[in-house]
From Swiss-Prot:
The species this protein was found in: Latilactobacillus sakei (Lactobacillus sakei)
Family that this chain belongs to: Belongs to the HrcA family.
GO biological process, one term: negative regulation of DNA-templated transcription
Lineage, broadest ranks: Bacteria, Bacillati, Bacillota, Bacilli, Lactobacillales
Annotated protein name in UniProt: Heat-inducible transcription repressor HrcA
Keyword check for Transmembrane helix: no
InterPro entries tied to this protein: GAF-like_dom_sf, HrcA, HrcA_C, WH-like_DNA-bd_sf, WH_DNA-bd_sf, WHTH_HrcA_DNA-bd, WHTH_transcript_rep_HrcA_IDD
Transcription regulation recorded as keyword: yes
Pfam families noted in UniProt: HrcA (PF01628), HrcA_DNA-bdg (PF03444)
Amino acid sequence: MLTERQLMILKEIIRLFTESGQPVGSKKLMSELPMHVSSATIRNDMADLENVGLIEKTHSSSGRVPSMKGYRYYLDHLIQPAVLNPMDVATVQQSFGRHYHKIDEIVSQSANILSNLTSYTAITLGPEMAEIRLTGFRLVPLGNHQVMAIIVTSAGTVDNQVFTIPNAISGDELEKAIRVVNDHLIGLPLTVVSQKLKTEVPALLMQYMGSPGGFLNIFDDVLKQASQERLYVGGQSNLLNFSELTDVSQLKSIYNIINQSDDLAKLLELSPGEANSQVQVRLGDEMTNDLLKNYSLMTVNYDVGEHGQGLIALLGPTSMPHSRMIGLLDLFREELAKKLIDYYADFDDNQS
């Protein structure tokens, strides 16, 4: 069992290594500890910490650095969120002070704001889609058998795609199909709309068009675009600033992790109904990708009441100042949730 002094030494080694990136020796610790401890005593305590695997020696220095086990122990037992300085608080609050026109705009911009504040890679996910409803659907003729399909949702999002209409579908049939959508699907949650496309809607469309498959494909494609979980990334290139890899192909692979939605969702371990009210930290050897062994991933959920929950994540070096980042993420999720709740309230007022 570690003594209070050994725990204090471990915390100081992590703090000093985080600040300087240099191995920490007994002389440096002697000048930084809040009580007088001899260099010999510190060396003995460091030897004990090394024996249990919490710190380790580097080849190029007589000092010690935290091990992955040491970081995990620190994160599980010793860390306290840092009290943010007023400038950090003001910067976050001012960043959300501008007017936004869409939910997506707020969530995507928040990734850029957080990345700029931290110099790390930031990832944000909008509130869950379960309560978002279909509020509008239109087909705008573009000529040459092309139409633009437009879907509007209760989240304030507008999604559109251009499609080529099969020759077998007439303009009159399209108008009737749009009427079916407006009569039977408007106002329903997107998840319910998706289900009805496979069950009730085909039979309804068969009353008005000989082959509804073409129209169903159009509507289904643009609905999927509106329904997909949106992950936004800020500061993609920051990820490469902390890599110890020199192989170009491996560096490209790291960069691709955050540019491929499936890889990113897997990294974040997104799963329905799972929510973290506290900031969670995963270290490199705890992640699914070996290329990230020198990185640390911090995630936390934010709550937007009846509109669901979203997620904020930070991906940076294992040696990032976790205490400050936890404090910053706690503040950031509060401000993001406030902004989204205000947006939803304004949107509801405008709809009534």
